[in-house]
């Protein structure tokens, strides 16, 4: 078993993800939203690249069975039902519903990983459940950090490190690339997540938009035991 890390969506290529188990992380906030929604009984989530595509696909559904969710530049999209706050995706809102979703970074990363053997959705809130599944798969793994506007994101990187760290506790002979080793070392040195992520640029953006409650939620460790999986069409509970 070998683990590699891709530092942003801009660095995803078919040869890197092909036939690998791909783990997509957009901790602030898309994969935290997806994990929360699936945990709260959402039937499926369908990710789209553009707002226009999302709105067009919504026409195929009855209004009472579909929810539009997402953001651009961390702000709710006009005409959508929900923003990209995981706190909005409560059981009473999403249970048995289909969520059509588009975000700046997360859904872009997902749609670039379609050649992966499996595509797993991970966040800080379900990291240990993801690590457990990855050990069960026993395949080569690529952890894809969605990043922020194509750039490296500290928050996604430490989340990947947490997953790697959890796996190493159960299986010490995992082969790690240098960038995967560094991700693990970053987590080992910064287990108090907030003191690390507060240095991240995206953290500052979220603070400026008064999204402190989202930050507090997204940095919680392994509070959800659900692992969402993307089959290239929809995201469901594994």
UniProtKB/Swiss-Prot annotation:
Reaction(s) catalysed by this chain, per the record, are:
(2R)-O-phospho-3-sulfolactate + H2O = (2R)-3-sulfolactate + phosphate
Pfam families, sorted: 2-ph_phosp
What InterPro entries does UniProt report for this protein, alphabetically?
Answer: ComB-like, ComB-like_sf
In terms of domain of life, where is this protein from?
Bacteria
Identify the keywords attached in UniProt to this record, alphabetized.
Hydrolase, Magnesium
Q: What lineage does UniProt assign to this protein's organism? A: Bacteria, Bacillati, Bacillota, Clostridia, Eubacteriales
GO MF term (any one): magnesium ion binding
> Matching Gene3D superfamilies, A to Z?
ComB-like (3.90.1560.10)
Q: Give the matching NCBIfam families.
A: PRK00886.1-4
The main enzyme category here is: hydrolase
**What's the cofactor?**
Mg(2+)
Q: Which EC number(s) does UniProt give? A: 3.1.3.71
Q: Which family, according to UniProt?
A: Belongs to the ComB family.
Q: What is this protein called?
A: Probable 2-phosphosulfolactate phosphatase
The record's PANTHER family line, in alphabetical order, gives: 2-PHOSPHOSULFOLACTATE PHOSPHATASE-RELATED
Q: Which gene name does the record give?
A: comB
């Amino acid at each position: 078993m070998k683990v590699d890390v891709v530092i942003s969506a801009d660095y995803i290529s078919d040869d890197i993800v092909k036939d690998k188990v791909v783990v997509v992380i957009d901790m602030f906030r898309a994969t935290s939203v997806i994990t929360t929604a699936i945990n709260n009984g959402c039937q499926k989530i369908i990710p789209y690249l553009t707002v226009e595509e999302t709105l067009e696909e919504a026409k195929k559904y009855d209004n009472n069975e579909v929810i539009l969710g997402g953001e651009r530049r961390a702000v709710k999209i006009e005409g959508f039902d929900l923003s990209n706050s995981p706190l909005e995706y409560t059981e009473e809102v999403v249970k048995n519903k289909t969520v059509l979703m588009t975000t700046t970074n997360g859904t872009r990363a997902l749609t670039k990983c379609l050649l992966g053997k499996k595509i797993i959705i991970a966040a800080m809130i379900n990291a240990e459940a993801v690590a457990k599944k990855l050990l069960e798969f026993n395949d080569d793994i690529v952890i894809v950090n969605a990043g922020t506007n194509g750039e490296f994101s500290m928050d996604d990187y430490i989340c990947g490190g947490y997953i790697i760290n959890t796996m190493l506790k159960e299986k010490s002979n995992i082969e790690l690339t240098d960038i995967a080793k560094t991700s693990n070392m970053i987590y080992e040195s910064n287990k108090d997540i907030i003191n690390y992520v507060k240095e991240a640029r995206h953290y500052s953006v979220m603070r400026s938009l008064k999204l402190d409650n989202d930050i507090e939620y997204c940095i919680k460790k392994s509070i959800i035991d659900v692992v969402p999986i993307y089959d290239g069409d929809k995201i469901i509970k594994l």
